[in-house]
């Protein structure tokens, strides 16, 4: 879900006065995870880039993207580094107390990603004592830790996948 914009936009002209920079919607995202947001030929692209661009246009604002590592993405919204986050953010009670969430634009299904030959990891119960590559602020990292996993901190999905393929995480 997109989070941010603490005030409802009554009409388009008011939108530019409710943003960090006039006439601009400053958007925080990772930009490292296809098909959501990623770089292709040096240009930021993806589903969340397209969606946030369309929303900015509807508000008569110019989109400005700020790529940020996941672990500091939500904190950046709190410190007014950007107006909104478009980055498949999970809704938690703690986040709901601090931020407004849009209607979900995506329902993601969570799965364990493991090496093809790993037949031991099939459920949360199987995580006990295993090394899991996760962002330190990930909802899934918290869940894995509660299930007894050892968390190997990584900045994002690309690094997590590398840890698994190089057998530095289960």
Question: Predicted regions span which residues?
Answer:
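Short helix-initiation/N-cap motifs at beta->coil->alpha
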Residues: 65-75, 119, 137, 152-168
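Short, low-complexity disordered leader/linker segments with a strong preference
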Residues: 1-24
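Short, well-ordered beta-strand segments
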Residues: 26-28, 113, 131-133
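Secondary-structure junction motif
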Residues: 133-147
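Extracytoplasmic small-molecule ligand-binding "clamshell" domains
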Residues: 17-88
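Ligand-binding "clamshell"
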Residues: 93-106
């Amino acid at each position: 879900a997109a989070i941010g914009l603490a005030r409802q936009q009554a009409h388009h002209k008011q939108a530019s006065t409710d943003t960090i920079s006039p006439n601009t919607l400053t958007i925080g995202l990772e930009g490292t995870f296809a098909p959501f947001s990623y770089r292709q030929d040096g240009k930021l692209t993806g589903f969340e880039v397209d969606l946030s661009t369309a929303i900015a246009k509807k508000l008569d604002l110019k989109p400005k993207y700020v790529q940020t590592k996941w672990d500091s993405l939500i904190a950046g919204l709190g410190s007014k580094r950007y107006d909104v986050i478009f980055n498949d953010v999970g809704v938690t009670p703690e986040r709901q107390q601090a931020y407004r969430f849009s209607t979900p634009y995506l329902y993601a299904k969570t799965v364990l990603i493991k090496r093809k030959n790993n037949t031991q990891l099939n459920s949360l119960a199987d995580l006990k004592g295993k090394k899991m590559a996760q962002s330190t602020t990930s909802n899934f990292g918290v869940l894995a830790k509660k299930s007894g996993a050892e968390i190997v901190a990584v900045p994002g999905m690309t690094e997590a996948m590398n840890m698994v393929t190089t057998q530095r995480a289960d």
